[in-house]
């Protein structure tokens, strides 16, 4: 356990400290962050609101069917990829706010595809494997064209891009409505939760595309 200012961290060995917005943050994979002053319930409620709004939007567009399909494996992979994704996305917030959250959905598409295709191989792939020729900037096109094998000029790709862009715009609108001070610690945490929601939505869209469905299982007596 150690502190940075008034903040307290409980970490594993080799924890990575990164600086974002001039503040120090710890790798989500290595540490558990304890903040006695932050309204955790607020973040949980906001995350639920974001996910519900995106679920409604995606269902209206036919990308989902009223449920966010998910697996524990895929959700856990976000925890591994999140620190490096955040390091790429945060600098994009000011100029490209929609991109900064939307690319997490494409990452979700890719991870869900890997979970179905060859999970053991995809688990070993570093975050940078999802980069396009221009790195983070064209990650979206690389994932759609090269991983999912969907031609970028196809109706499927265009519909997917339109839906993810709409989700990103919805998320940005919800964040702005909260009137959180920019570049504050709370703003960082809200952004992190927003990216997690976008990742899950992207994964759910791909799981549906691959034919997975949610089924209730009745347990025997």
Please provide the spans of the model-predicted regions.
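N-terminal amphipathic/basic-hydrophobic helices that include classical n-h-c signal peptides
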Residues: 1-36
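Intrinsic-disorder/low-complexity detector
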Residues: 22-221
